[in-house]
Structures are given as C-alpha cells and as structure tokens.
UniProtKB/Swiss-Prot annotation:
Gene: cgt
Catalytic center residues: D256, E284
Site description Transition state stabilizer, residues in chain: D355
Region: A1, residue numbers: 28-165
Residues reported in the UniProt entry to bind Ca(2+) 2: N166, I217, D226, H260
Stretch forming the signal peptide: 1-27
Molecular functions per Gene Ontology: alpha-amylase activity; cyclomaltodextrin glucanotransferase activity; metal ion binding; starch binding
Name of the protein this chain belongs to: Cyclomaltodextrin glucanotransferase
Family membership: Belongs to the glycosyl hydrolase 13 family.
Domain notes: May consist of two protein domains: the one in the N-terminal side cleaves the alpha-1,4-glucosidic bond in starch, and the other in the C-terminal side catalyzes other activities, including the reconstitution of an alpha-1,4-glucosidic linkage for cyclizing the maltooligosaccharide produced.
Quaternary assembly: Monomer.
Domain CBM20 residues, every copy: 607-712
Class of the enzyme per the UniProt entry, highest EC level: transferase
Residue intervals of the IPT/TIG domain: 526-606
Amino acid sequence: MKRFMKLTAVWTLWLSLTLGLLSPVHAAPDTSVSNKQNFSTDVIYQIFTDRFSDGNPANNPTGAAFDGSCTNLRLYCGGDWQGIINKINDGYLTGMGITAIWISQPVENIYSVINYSGVHNTAYHGYWARDFKKTNPAYGTMQDFKNLIDTAHAHNIKVIIDFAPNHTSPASSDDPSFAENGRLYDNGNLLGGYTNDTQNLFHHYGGTDFSTIENGIYKNLYDLADLNHNNSSVDVYLKDAIKMWLDLGVDGIRVDAVKHMPFGWQKSFMSTINNYKPVFNFGEWFLGVNEISPEYHQFANESGMSLLDFPFAQKARQVFRDNTDNMYGLKAMLEGSEVDYAQVNDQVTFIDNHDMERFHTSNGDRRKLEQALAFTLTSRGVPAIYYGSEQYMSGGNDPDNRARIPSFSTTTTAYQVIQKLAPLRKSNPAIAYGSTQERWINNDVIIYERKFGNNVAVVAINRNMNTPASITGLVTSLPQGSYNDVLGGILNGNTLTVGAGGAASNFTLAPGGTAVWQYTTDATAPINGNVGPMMAKAGVTITIDGRASARQGTVYFGTTAVTGADIVAWEDTQIQVKILRVPGGIYDIRVANAAGAASNIYDNFEVLTGDQVTVRFVINNATTALGQNVFLTGNVSELGNWDPNNAIGPMYNQVVYQYPTWYYDVSVPAGQTIEFKFLKKQGSTVTWEGGANRTFTTPTSGTATVNVNWQP
C-alpha cells in the first residue's frame, strides 16, 4: 500500500463561458435517489433480510432449515424481499426518514444444514455463497429482487447489497462431504469445490490466527473456503457477478471482510465497478475497542472504497452505553478522524450491527440509545441504523444480535428521533457535508457544531441522567435569533436564543437532554461537499456534490481545467464531469462558478492510468537485515512513479511464499508494458536492486504473476 504524491499539471486550460452563450445542462439534485455516488445526504437502514418481515411464506425453506418461531436463531425465520417491499409500501421505512436500505447478500447460498457442536446452522445470514449470479430463493426470485429495487426507488430509497467475495461457504480439507464442500457455481454451472481443487480456485494454507495482515488474507477465515483472487477464473467471475447486480439497479455495495482479501485485487475490483457503473462502496474491517490499525485508515484512503467507521462505533458505545470514556474521548475521536481519513464524510457511521452486541441492553436505559442515535444522525459520515434499534432490540453476540424484529411501532421515542433528524441530511448541507467543531464540553456534556458554508447545525448532549448542565459562554456560528429544538423536546431539549456574534444566552440542559438547532441559507460561493467515486480512469464521469452556482463554470483537476463538453451536467447542488486524460496520480478537485469564485479543495482523488488488473509480483533470494523490508516501484502511478516513498509494500514473505521470497498482489494498468524494480527499505535508507529496469506486459483481463530473482 502507498500514499501517492499530489500531481500538479504543468499546463492550464481556462474555460470561459459567456453568459447566455451556452445554456447550462442540469444534473439531479444532490439529494436525489438517482445519486448513486454520494450517500452523505442519506440515512441507511441495515436489514438482516431473514429477520425483518416475511412477505411471502411460500418461499420459506422447509424441514430442518426453517424455524417459523425464530427460536433457533441459526435457522431461517422467513424474512424476504417481499416483506421489505411491504414495509416500504406501508410507510414504516419512509415514515422513519430512511432513504437507503442495506440488505443481506442476495446471492444463492448453500442449502445444507450444518451441525456445529450439536446445533443446526444455516445460511440465513447470506454469507455462505455458492453462486454469486443467482438469488437466494429464501429471500425471493430475481423478479422479486427487481420489484424491491423498483419499489424502493419509487419511494426515494436507495438499495445497498452486501457482497462477500472473500469466500464461499464452510468446507473441510479432510472431508469433502462436509456441508457443500465450499463449491462455487457460475449461474448453475459447477466451477469447483474446496477439496480436489485442481483449478486452484481456493487458498489451501489453513485457518488464519489473525496474527498479521498477510495471515488474514491468504488463510481461511474460520472454516470458510477462501477464494484465490489471483486465479483469473475467480477474478473474472466475481467482477462479472458484481456487474450483473449493478445492471439490476443496486445503488451501493457493502463489501464484507476487506481486511481478509488482497488489497491490490480489491483496488482492481473497485476500478471495475467505478469504470462500469459507479456506486457508493464501503467495506467492513472490524476493529475492537481502542484498537489502532494504520492499515485500516490506509485502506480507507487508497482502496477506492469507504469503510464502516468502527472507531466511531466503539467510541460511541464507550461514551453513551458503557460509561468507560467521557465526552473528551468522544471529541478526541472526532478530531482524530479528521486527520486519519482523507475524506471523513464518506465513512459509514453506526453504533451496532450484526457483528457486535446490540447497543441497547435488556432493561437498559433507553435514553442512552436515543442519545447515541441522535449523535450518529447529526455527526459527520453516512449514518447506518441497525434494524430494530428503533424498537429497542437487545441481544449479545451472534446470533442473539440477529433476532426477528419484534414489532413495527412508529410511536417509540427512538423511531421519532430518527424520524425528526434523518430529514436534516437532505435539508441542511451542514449535516451532510459540514465540518465539526466542539463548542462546549465537560465530562458529561458536549455541544458541537456542523458547518458548511453559512449553513449551521448545533447539537447539545448531556449524558448525565441525573444532573442538569448549566451552559454558559456558548458561542456558535448561528445568526442572531431564536431556534427551536429540531427534536421538538422529545429528549428534553430546549429553545436556544442567540445574540450578536453567535453568543448564546445561558441555559440549562436537562438531565439526559439532547437538542438540535439549525440554520440554512443559500451559498454565496461554490463549496464542495462530496466527490464520487474517488478513484477512476480518464473518461469516467464523476459526481461533485455541494453548492456551486446555477450558471456553469469550471472544474479543475489540479490546475487542469475541464473543457465545456466534458462538463456533463451542472446544477446548483450537483456537477457531473468527465475525468480528463491527465497523468495517473492524486489530484485536488475544485470548482469555480461563472463569476470566477473558487470553491474549497476536495483532495485525494486518484486518476488511474487505465483499466486495472491484478498482478502478483514475486521476488526470490531477497535477503534482508533485521528491520529491513522489500518494496516494489515502477513507472506508473499505481507503482509509485519510481518514488521510494510511494513504493508498494512492505511485501509479504510468510504464507504463499516464504522468506527470502517476497510477494504482493498489485493493481496495475491493464494491457500495458510497465517498468518496475524492487528495493529494500529500512527507515530512510533505500537499497535498489541492480541491473536494468524490468519490464512486463500486463494482461487485458484476469490476473498474472511475475516471478523473478533479486538482481545484485
């Protein structure tokens, strides 16, 4: 992995459009359901499909795989796509303000019932795939899936699918009769199974002990048959499969287990999506409480996808649920994330999901959940609400955190908190795109401000359930006036009076009180809020959301201006523009309106050299001193443009190959002859291998392997 240097083009081409000479082409508003690249204005509702609503009992599994009472939470309970359709049509989701749903992986899963320690287990969760090009019949038919997409879109709801390309299903290297032997099918045609794997579709290095990143990538996750992404058949199959789901109209993809797949392959996978039909993508890289992982943030910044924001979730749980940290810890997390993430507003925030205990505990204080929901809905990032949170569902780890939703009440306070705050993401860009600043704090109280241009939202939370907080000396960016609590007092909030200079009148925040005050106004200058996708090749159309001007102006990649024909559409809240044929690398994006007023810089956009394929680079006999590692660089931006600081690595040497052989799977331009070399690094000391630059012609599709010896 690497961080690219920013490129500044040496040429500048100014685009000047005379008013009235060219009528502006209009894009959709940034809040539109058709905006598949930007979810900052959305609230996601995560649905475990089997546990939500049974809309069609006829498709329920039979026999030992099904428990209609949902007592055995490891069996199917009956939820399906028709059930989700019904809850869209009856207003349950739209009434809550939900504008995106994230559903279980829709692909066909194994049918076997597996006995683990005397307990029957099924693929109700959707993570035991057998055919990525067919649907799980327990969820519905392909027509049912299309109906779900159409119904959701008709109600202004986007659809995100879970997708797990890391593995197929449980398998045993010693027993081909166990479960379904991890078999993989291509639209019904068998490609192969885990045992007798003559085509090398899977990894066969045993189970991971999670000791290193390399160990987790190339060894099996538990007993799941780990797919070999360096196999051309697997690579092409998975990319064709995701194209099929994109063709069906999905708006986003949540990629499972990104920590456990080669990073280079995932970058080429994202390139395939972005070059085909760009949608919002985010991955799952689990982090525990206070766990620090530089690789986690590096992946978020360089892979082409966002991440589920586990540091956010874990800190919110510590502060609002467990009382193991205070508001200063919450502030530190928010401020640290501004540095750690290149684009913090793209990360998906949450307080619980199917991989952790539910936030709410049995007989716990409901106000804790309500405050955590308010915090998530008004904080930076894209909020995701786990199904049933609005009904105060509780439950420990898997499978207790995946129970059937008990009711669909629209009168719970939690439902109303979501209902009142979710619309702010579309009505106030400060919530969708704004910066975050702490305005008042002590151990139990935080007041923070979100600001985008002159749009402002101020949020106050007192987590102390027994003691009111006397708020004095609060200064905000709100104009002078009186502001009602957006929550309408349901969490004991109050009206805020603001005087000259943003100074708020002293007030008392009730025990357990939460209030939200907000102000919106028109922009006076362009301001960028979101760019998506954040990685693509020249010629791909990207979407810039924020506030600009109704009159078409100029978009810049670095100092290179886009010409008129390459500005596909222009509207006050959204611009669509084609990437110019500039050298591959990292660029700043900015917008200037017709009057010449310039926007803020949106940085870290990667222009790829071209279509991407994955190549495994292997170097033999590369002996190193203690603390020294081997890296790879070359003449394209994907290899660091010969800069040792941007070289790929450190390479691996433990699982697929062992020291002194090193290897790494890298995303490189397809169908091109590239130059490359290996080097050794220890701190700032760099030792290049000798000899001439190496060359390799990459394939136009599939994967390849380069295997060479170290040149002294």
